[in-house]
UniProtKB/Swiss-Prot annotation:
Residues in Galectin domain copies: 39-168
Domain of life, per lineage: Eukaryota
InterPro entries noted in UniProt: ConA-like_dom_sf, Galectin-like, Galectin_CRD
Pfam families noted in UniProt: Gal-bind_lectin
Gene name tied to this protein: LGALSL
N-acetylalanine: residues bearing it: A2
Function per UniProt: Does not bind lactose, and may not bind carbohydrates.
Modified residues (Phosphoserine): S22, S25
Record text on subunit structure and interactions: Monomer.
Keywords of this entry: Acetylation, Lectin, Phosphoprotein
Name of the protein in its database record: Galectin-related protein
Amino acid sequence: MAGSVADSDAVVKLDDGHLNNSLSSPVQADVYFPRLIVPFCGHIKGGMRPGKKVLVMGIVDLNPESFAISLTCGDSEDPPADVAIELKAVFTDRQLLRNSCISGERGEEQSAIPYFPFIPDQPFRVEILCEHPRFRVFVDGHQLFDFYHRIQTLSAIDTIKINGDLQITKLG
């Protein structure tokens, strides 16, 4: 898995299996940057900790049904890795669902949001900020909700998985 995902002008690289990025210049929707393959699975170097932020920028597909962004404890499929937080955008219901899955048991799903922030064929920016008691989730710079930690060992949350009806343009 070592090597560069894209050429030297790329923003995101996978080196030695670790997700790294360059935040030296602002990203605009009309600037070219390589598409990352969906479904995507990447390692979060050092795992999560208070103050650490995960950034996902992308473009929603033209006719989307749903997409999901998950932070997990590893990438195991059998047994499945614990899911610290899964964000699932469901376009038919205009919902942004949140949940966790620990030892195969799904937690209580949360769905309340002030508005549905995603628009088909439009870019978006999701930031997941890890704080001591919770994740704070922002979309396009606006805080949408808090999700209180259900996994207490934050450093074990070391993988990001993205799938569904979107194109990823930047990860950080």
